[in-house]
Each structure stands twice: as C-alpha cells, then as structure tokens.
From Swiss-Prot:
InterPro entries: MMPL_dom, Mycobact_MmpL, SSD. It is found in: Cell inner membrane. It is a multi-pass membrane protein. Belongs to the resistance-nodulation-cell division (RND) (TC 2.A.6) family. MmpL subfamily. The gene is mmpL11. The lineage of its organism: Bacteria, Bacillati, Actinomycetota, Actinomycetes, Mycobacteriales. Keywords: Cell inner membrane, Cell membrane, Membrane, Transmembrane, Transmembrane helix, Transport, Virulence. This is Heme uptake protein MmpL11. Part of a heme-iron acquisition system. Receives heme from the heme-binding protein Rv0203 and transports it into the mycobacterial cell. Contributes to virulence. Could also transport the mycolic acid-containing lipids monomeromycolyl diacylglycerol (MMDAG) and mycolate ester wax (WE) to the bacterial surface. The chain crosses the membrane at residues 13-33, 188-208, 214-234, 235-255, 279-299, 311-331, 373-393, 527-547, 557-577, 595-615, 646-666, 668-688. Pfam families: MMPL (PF03176).
Amino acid sequence: MMRLSRNLRRCRWLVFTGWLLALVPAVYLAMTQSGNLTGGGFEVAGSQSLLVHDQLDAHYPDRGAPALALVAAPRPDASYQDIDNAVALLRQIASELPGVTEAPNPTQRPPQPDRPYVVSLRLDARNAGTSDVAKKLRDRIGVKGDQSGQTANGKVRLYVIGQGALSAAAAANTKHDIANAERWNLPIILMVLVAVFGSLAAAAIPLALAVCTVVITMGLVFVLSMHTTMSVFVTSTVSMFGIALAVDYSLFILMRYREELRCGRRPPDAVDAAMATSGLAVVLSGMTVIASLTGIYLINTPALRSMATGAILAVAVAMLTSATLTPAVLATFARAAAKRSALVHWSRRPASTQSWFWSRWVGWVMRRPWITALAASTVLLVMAAPATLMVLGNSLLRQFDSSHEIRTGAAAAAQALGPGALGPVQVLVRFDAGGASAPEHSQTIAAIRHRIAQAPNVVSVAPPRFADDNGSALLSAVLSVDPEDLGARDTITWMRTQLPRVAGAAQVDVGGPTALIKDFDDRVSATQPLVLVFVAVIAFLMLLISIRSVFLAFKGVLMTLLSVAAAYGSLVMVFQWGWARGLGFPALHSIDSTVPPLVLAMTFGLSMDYEIFLLTRIRERFLQTGQTRDAVAYGVRTSARTITSAALIMIAVFCGFAFAGMPLVAEIGVACAVAIAVDATVVRLVLVPALMAMFDRWNWWLPRWLAHILPSVDFDRPLPKVDLGDVVVIPDDFAAAIPPSADVRMVLKSAAKLKRLAPDAICVTDPLAFTGCGCDGKALDQVQLAYRNGIARAISWGQRPVHPVTVWRKRLAVALDALQTTTWECGGVQTHRAGPGYRRRSPVETTNVALPTGDRLQIPTGAETLRFKGYLIMSRNSSHDYADFADLVDTMAPETAAAVLAGMDRYYSCQAPGRQWMATQLVGRLADPQPSDLGDQSPGADAQAKWEEVRRRCLSVAVAMLEEAR
C-alpha cells in the first residue's frame, strides 16, 4: 500500500483526471436513463408463478390481468355527463399513444356517477416496458407527485394503475425520498465531520468523495438497467451505502494521517503511513462487505439481485475513491487537511483528552470482564428477542402512503370491479400430449374448475381459455380479497395442495400476482439460512486473513450475529408493534420480505468495518509489545473516537433515509442504524475488550499449518520508524487548546522571514521548547495531569494552557523585532538611536519543530528568546519590552532565566569602549526598571498595579543573576 500511495501522490493530477472523466458520463446517464428502473423483479426462477406468467406471454396474448388501467373516480357532486366525459377523455388519451389499445372487460358496468369506472389497457410488442407508457399517461391526465389528475371541472379524479404505474410512481417517490434524505444527511454529516476534524477544509474531503461515489455508482447502475432488470429501490441503496461508506472510509484514513503527523512524520510520509494502515484496513473491509453482499445472489430473484448489485457497486466505488483519491487529495491539500480551526472547534477540551476517557473505560471493562460481557450479552439478547415474532410480507402498493394517488386509484378500481378483479388467480392446466380442448380432457378441466370454486375467498371462476397451441387451458379465479392480502396467500396454498388431487395426469400450476409474491417470500425464507451461513463463512475468512487469529475471527462473526439479531428485533418493535409511531414510522402488519436478507448481508459487511479497524489496530500494537491488555487498551484508546465518529455519520445517513423513505427503505434504514449503533458501542467497546481480557493469549492462537496457508498482509510489517533527528514534536497527549489558524499561518510566515534575516542561524537542542505552555508557572506535566483527571473543567479560560504553536508565534515575533531593530554582517552593527550600540557575537540559536500540519521549521530557542528580549531592553528601554520580559519569565523559575541571561556576554558585546559587560548592565536595568516611556502610561490604579508586578518579576531575575554570578 505504501508503494501504491507514493505512486498515486506522484501522479495525482492523472488520478484527478481519471475520476473526472468517470463523473461526466455518469452525470449524463443519471439525467437520461433513470426511466429503465422497474418496480417489479420479484419473479422466482423455476416457480409456478413464473411458469404461468411465461405461458401467458407466449400462448395467451389476450388473457391475464391488464398491463395498465385508467380509472375515473367521480366526486359526490358528479353527474352522468361528468363521468361520461371523463371516460371519453381517458379513452382518447389511451388511443393517442402508439401500441396502446383498450382491453374489453365483461365485468365492468357502464359509467355511473356513483361508481368509479376502469378502462383496461393492453400494450403490444412496441411497448416492452410499461413504465414509460405509464409515465406518459400520468403526465397526460395531470398526475402531480402524489396527487391525482382530474377533469377540467374537477368533479372526476383520474388515475393510472397497474404494474407500470407502480414502477413509475415508485421511481418518482425514491427520487423525492433521496433528495429529502440528502437534505437531512449532508448538514448532519458536515457537522459531525467539522466536530471531528475541527476544519471545514478537512470536513469537505469526505463529503466530496461521497458525492463522487454516489454519482459514479448511479451511472453504473443506469448502464446495467439498459441490459438487465434493476429495481427502483436500488437508487436508495446506492445513495445510502455510497454516502455512508465513502465518508467512513475517508474518515479512517484522514484520522490516521493526522495521527502520523502528530508523531512527527512529514506530510508525504504521513500519507503513505496512513494508507499502509487505515488504507489497507479500508480495502480489506470493502472486500469483506462486497463478499458478504454476494450472498444475496443465492436467493436468485431480480429485485434482490439488483439491490445487491447496486450496494456492491457502491462499496467498490467507495473503496476505490478512498484508496486512490484520498492520497491524491492529501498530497495536494496536505496543510488544509491537517490544520484545525479554533473557530469551528466547538469543545474547549482538546480532542486528545478523549483518549484518556477511553483508556479508563477499557481498563474498567477489562478489570471485570465476566460481568461486563454478561451484561452486554443480555442487552443484545433482549433486543433480539422480538425477532422471533417477525411476520414477513411483500407489497409494492403498500410502499405508498394511504393518501397517495396510486393507492387511492387502486382502491377506486377495487370499488368498481371488486378487490380481486385486477389480480385474479390464474390456474394453468397442462396436458403432456396437447389437445387441451379435446373432449377427453373436458371432464378434468371441469373438475378442476369446480374445485377452484370451493377454495376460500374465491368469488367466481371464468370459463376455460385455451392456448394458441392448444397445449394448456387457463382458468381465472377472482377473489373477494385484495391480491396482496394475507388471505389471498392462503388461497394460493390451498389451491396448490388440493388441485393436483383432482387433476389426474394433467399438470396444474397456480400463478397470478398473489402467487408471484408468495413464491418470492417462500424463496427468501427458504434461502435465508443459506445466505446466513455463506455470509458468516466469508466474514470469518476475511477476519482470519486480516487478524490471523482463529478465536478473534470466530468472536467477530458471533458478535456481528448478535448485532444483526438486535437489528431484526428493532424492526419488529418499530414497525410491527408500532412503538415509533410518534416519530412518523407507520405501523405495519408485516416486515417486507426483502429486508431481512438485505439487512443480514449489509450489516454483516458494515460491522466488519469496525471489527477490522479495531482489531487490526490492536494487533498492530500487540506485534510491538506482545502484551494483550496493553494492546487492547491502546487499540480502543486510539480508535474509539474514530469508530464513534464514523458510526455517528453512518447512523445519520441511515436515519435520514429511514425518516424520508418508503416503508421498505425505512425498514432497511432503521435496521442498519440500530445494527451500527449496537455494534459500535456495546460490541466494540464492551464485548470486544471484555472477551479479549478473558482469553488473553488465546486471542492470538493460530495453528502453524494454517499460518503457512493464510496470505500475509501488510499489518504484519511494522511501519518505518519516524526519523525525527533533532525535531521537536508536540506530544500526542498535550492537553492544550487547538491552535488558531491565524497562529499557524503567522508561524509559517515568521519562520520564513527569520530564515531570511538570520541565514547563518544554527540548530541546537531546546530544553525550553514547551516553556510557556503552562500558566501561572505550572509545569507542563502538571497541566496535563489536571486534564487527565478531569480537573480542567474547573479551570477558567484565562488559566488554560497555551498551545505550543501560540508560544512559538510569540517567540518568532520577539526574534523578528530584535533582528529588525539592528542588523549585523560580519560583525557590523547598526544601533538603535535610543540606546547604546551592541554587537552580536554569535549566530542565532534555533531549534527544529514540527507543526500539527506536518510542516517543519526553525524557531528561536527559549533561551534565545530571552536573550533577544534582554537585548531589546538594553537597546530600546521601553515599558513594552519590560512587560514582555515579565511575561516570559513568569512561565519559568527566575533561576532558569538568570542562568540564561548570565551568559549574555557570549552572545552580545558593547561597541562603545570602556562600557560595562552587557550582562552587568542588564542586571542594573532589571533591578530598577526606568523605561524611557514610563510617563506615557495610563495613571490609573490598575496600570500602576500591573507595572509594580512587572518590576517585581524583573527584580527577581536580577537578584537571581547576582546569585548566579557568585
């Protein structure tokens, strides 16, 4: 990964160009090809319903339920003339579309003002897709969003119903839902990212990658939709996964990049190190999610297959953007991605202090592992218990609100023709030798028809119709219940059990809309255990390769199963039991049958993100120390904040779709949000450390023969050590405020100016590098201890420690002031007119420091800053210099300042002959400060008190210098 990262950094403009070239056609496809998505795709290969459907298409061109229908629903004040005009208008609109004809319906009564009227339509071969025709019809009758069309006088409402209309309405709804969800998601994600990174520039990087991921994936989906069945719900899946994973993956890498910068690495090296660790974890996690989602293909239905394909594409593109675009972006905007802004850093407590909370937390958990593990497991099992009462169903119509025009149109058609008229049960009777209409088969067909009439919920059975090849007979039964009602499914089950008993040698297949849905649900229920086993095995193998531990891989799979079970339980509580009705979630009789397998594969894959990210961090530490408890504490301490932030983002994304989406999307959103929340908290932060503390060395058990078989990953190779040399690095646990961006900018500018003014400066070790970061004379370690113990909340803002960058800015300001007050070249000097002439005898002493942005630069040492300020006192004798000097010595012991200033004569000498040594003169100035501008100060009592404090501090240093001279 490090080699790949280096290549991507070098060729970053080529990387940007490649992704830009992928974006352009994706945007075009999104604008032109979205109409290819369908609301169907629930056919099951080899099922009776699909066989009947195919036979009807092949041999019964004029039979079956109408593809589309137009409905005129009169209002109470409508007249005969109004309904007649409305029906005539619908027939005229239908006749204007090529390939659309009216299908006669013998059960339809003449138009009446107290009853809706249905105009059934058929489409010929020129209209392969009913969705496009439905869109045209909806536009022509005036359907707007979820509102029906109406006649000119508004007395008759107009609707389009049928499978094509459902697809068109679902496509419009999902587009609207995605827009609503993103209006909710993006601001929340931005707020979380700004809180995490403390910088709008850094927060913009994951959002930009998320947008790129979603747009490109949508383009790929629309390309596939031109060649295969793609469900309308795939767009919601792509948007959910694309945003959540792209943001999460880039967040992992950016957080590690900043951590490597804090360790002292230069920005290019920090990028490579982040990619070799978090970048590799992202790739492994993405591959695990993709492998888990392939389990959906075992169900082998077009709808689920298309949704899995969309999710897989979203994961793959998110993984690729994170692994390729992130290094290129960091190479281009390294400083912007690294720095934090005090303006958007909302908490006064620094981010680094959070690790101490997690350190104490994991220590508390590991000291009582049995209790915490038992408590966490109990919570998960209680959450999972309602899953045993889950009822599965499937209804595209019920994905719409009850007031939606597609629902009210279907209700009007049911009122006109009966609830089961638009979805009759279709019984196909086949004879091996053909001749279905032959007299010898009439008795068999009559017996089957008689038996159908005895089935529950059957209202009428139409006379048999024969295939154009005379190989089969079709019997249509109209039910008294809606085709999507659970009672209709009972009828299908009864027919499939009873009809073969009276069919003799004939083959009986039961189809129709209800049978189609039932076959789909049965296939999902039958194959879900297989999907579970497949996904669990894939996850186990990926964890085994990543972590090289049998126990940890098994534990990871088991913990994820608990998270999935808790998510299933939440579905029952929220939707079946209606506990969240107050939040706007509808109470449903059943959970959509597509949701459990999708949630299983999705959450299994997503949970592996945190499992791999946490355990690889623990393993990385274990390889260095060999101590399990230390490795667990370190892994949780360094990754808990990242995991929590990533989980918050993912939960926000899923909740956005849950609140804005159709019931199927809402169910997926709720389940995934609960699974991620449980996994990132109860599992990763309680069960993982507790179980690892229980099993200690067994955590790393791996048979020798298996170790030789497993492929090696880069986690086993330690990162190159940071070559700091004499560079001063800000401690990772430094308890200080975030440096203001202005300070960072000024330090960079001032350091560059210092290099020009003092080109012969030398670098030395600076024991006073962090002097001034503590307040009121506190040592740095005391201030750190206060923060670690939580005392910092009681410290006023004025007493809080100062960030080293702010201190270094002040040092550079003093140095530039002194260097611009006088200049020297080869011993030459230009003296200030207000004071005696002094000559610099030795080069300026500086030290190398590393900023949080990764920049390395030279600043004056703490001792040199004191000498510069002493020089300014002697040169200008201003009250401002005395006050600055007092502030400098206030951060250290007077003896320390005296030891530095006592050696002034090695750095400066007096130009005038016969003058005293500079250190001796400085003692006199400090013992009795008499600045030349003392009369210009404010005469107030506060100013006088402050000046007396300055005199006291200067005197303490003068006394210490005299003591030093003894």
